[in-house]
């Protein structure tokens, strides 16, 4: 049963909590149970690559074994929580939208831009269908939508949002691992960590560009820029 359906049946009689996959700290605690923790930078690289699904860190699995487990989780979610529940017939269309969003973690895009791209490669899907698929992927907790916040106008913008994955291993289990994707996956990791800590997270739009994340929790506001390395001439 989806969370929205639970709300319908149990109005006023339940409290919902969003459960995330393992944080980096939790990942290290799991790993200490069966092996020696390596250099922290190497561990972070492994965490980005292997993700934080608890089932993949109960013992020392190979990368291929991890991705097999995660792919099973992905397939179960796609086919049970999305395809079957919503009676989707054109599964190939849904999977193309999934692959596009997974490949474009950290990039701003819209349902229209996805539709335009798929049309350019001879797989036309209308905007409304793409938008519907994105909503269903959100409701199944595979994707998190991150809106843009105009820091000057102090308002949420409704265009060019970003989407982040519930876990970085989802991306690699579906698309395969490539080193050039690490920067955007690191951004995904930071986004999830801010959410775990109870922040409402948006992308900060400025006249000259953007701040990766504006994180708000009551009166506490953080401005976060994510980078793999900081180069300095000092």
Q: Which sequence ranges carry the predicted segments?
A:
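A cross-kingdom feature that marks ATP-driven nucleic-acid transaction machinery
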Residues: 129-234
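Short, basic interhelical loop/turn and adjoining N-cap
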Residues: 120-129
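Short hinge/gating elements
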Residues: 80-84, 116-121, 170-180
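Interdomain motor-coupling "hinge/lid" segment immediately C-terminal to the ATP-binding subdomain
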Residues: 3-108
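A generic structural signal for residues located within well-ordered alpha-helices
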Residues: 89-92, 125, 185-186
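Short acidic, hydrophobic short linear motifs in intrinsically disordered regions
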Residues: 107-118
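Short, locally clustered residues in the helix-turn-helix/winged-helix DNA-binding domain
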Residues: 99-103, 119, 195
């Amino acid at each position: 049963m989806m969370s929205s359906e639970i709300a319908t049946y149990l109005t006023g009689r339940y409290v919902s909590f969003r459960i995330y996959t393992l944080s980096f700290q939790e990942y290290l605690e799991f790993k200490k149970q069966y092996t020696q923790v390596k250099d922290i930078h190497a561990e972070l690289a492994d965490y980005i690559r292997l993700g934080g699904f608890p089932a993949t860190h109960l013992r020392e699995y190979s990368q291929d074994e991890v991705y097999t487990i995660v792919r099973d989780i992905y397939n179960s979610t796609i086919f049970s929580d999305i395809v079957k529940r919503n009676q989707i017939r054109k599964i190939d269309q849904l999977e193309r939208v999934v692959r596009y969003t997974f490949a474009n973690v950290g990039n701003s895009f819209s349902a229209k831009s996805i539709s335009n791209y798929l049309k350019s490669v001879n797989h036309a899907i209308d905007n409304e269908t793409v938008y519907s698929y994105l909503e269903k992927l959100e409701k199944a907790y595979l994707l998190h939508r991150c809106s843009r916040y105009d820091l000057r106008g102090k308002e949420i913008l409704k265009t060019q949002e970003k989407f982040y994955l519930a876990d970085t291993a989802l991306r690699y289990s579906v698309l395969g691992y490539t080193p050039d994707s690490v920067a955007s996956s690191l951004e995904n990791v930071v986004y999830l960590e801010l959410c775990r800590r109870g922040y409402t997270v948006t992308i900060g739009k400025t006249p000259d560009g953007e701040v990766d994340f504006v994180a708000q929790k009551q009166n506490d506001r953080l401005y976060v820029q994510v980078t793999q390395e900081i180069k300095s001439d000092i």
